[in-house]
Amino acid sequence: MSRFIDFTLPSTVPGRTLHGFRCVPEGPVRAVLQLSHGMVEYIDRYRPLAEYLADRGILVTGHDHLGHGASIRTKEDYGYFAEPDGNRAVLADLHAVTVLTKELYPNLPYFLLGHSMGSFYARQYLCEYGRELNGAIIMGTGFQPKALVKIAKTLCRVLAAFHGWHYRSNLVASLSFMGYNKGLEGRTTHDWLNRDQAEVDKYLAEERCTFTFTLNAYYSMFSGILRLHDPAFLARMPKDLPLLFLSGDADPVGEQGKGVRRAIQSLKDAGVQNIESIFYPGARHELLVETNKLEVFGDIAAWLDKQLAKQ
């Protein structure tokens, strides 16, 4: 049986603390997979995947990003990253967990999985710290139009001038998720997440999944997304790093696959060569709790096995 170890770690932001877990295999550890979770959720939602992989010799670790899960001081911290540069803080914290994990489990192949917002941070991470990885899985990602992201970022800055960076703007939130539930109206506002209605209801009943982002977090996230439109930044990614993109072909974040393919093409244009992708018919955004989640778990494990066979 694998075992979970909860841990805390000082954030790279003074005075803040990160909460995380490690799921340690009972037998020999073959590799490490670090997780970067999505927007308005928390790392413990990934425990089923962690157990599945740990039973196959993969140690899985991850933490709650700032403003998420247990990485808060009070509930007022929900949806707030950091000032003056929240995007940098989230990236630096991801790397701090990498450093800690490599100190505890040295000389092992090391992989990163990022979902949704966490996928955008994972893609930035690959450009800054990619040489510390043996591969990465990019899940539930997209490719937002540069002009729209710039407008959204400017709107955040204007609103913050009047209300401050802790302000929670319903306008920005509405614009960010506009159209995601199109064609699914009538039951909940979040059926775009998943075909499994019980999982959607569970998500909506969870306090850690229903807060509104602050202007600070939106501005930080938009800043990071804009970096992914910069060819010079993407060119910093190791060209031979193995990547696996996973997406539901009914995921609105990835524009039903079109945005995911644009993200892949942007990396190919930057010279990245080793990219695979899987699109799941009918699946929506949250693949790890979708109706075909065991298929997704198996594909992740199989891809990791393939990479380890090359080591």
Features from the language model and the residues they span:
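Catalytic active-site module of serine/aspartate enzymes centered on a nucleophile-bearing elbow/loop
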Residues: A270-Q311
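Alpha/beta-hydrolase active-site loop
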Residues: A82-K102
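Alpha/beta-hydrolase fold nucleophile elbow
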Residues: Y105-S116
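Conserved alpha/beta-hydrolase
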Residues: P48-E76
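Alpha/beta-hydrolase-fold enzymes
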Residues: A122-R208
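Active-site glycine-rich loops that stabilize anionic/oxyanionic intermediates
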Residues: S36-E41, S116-M117, D249-A250
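N-terminal cap/lid segment of alpha/beta-hydrolase-fold proteins
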Residues: M1-G27
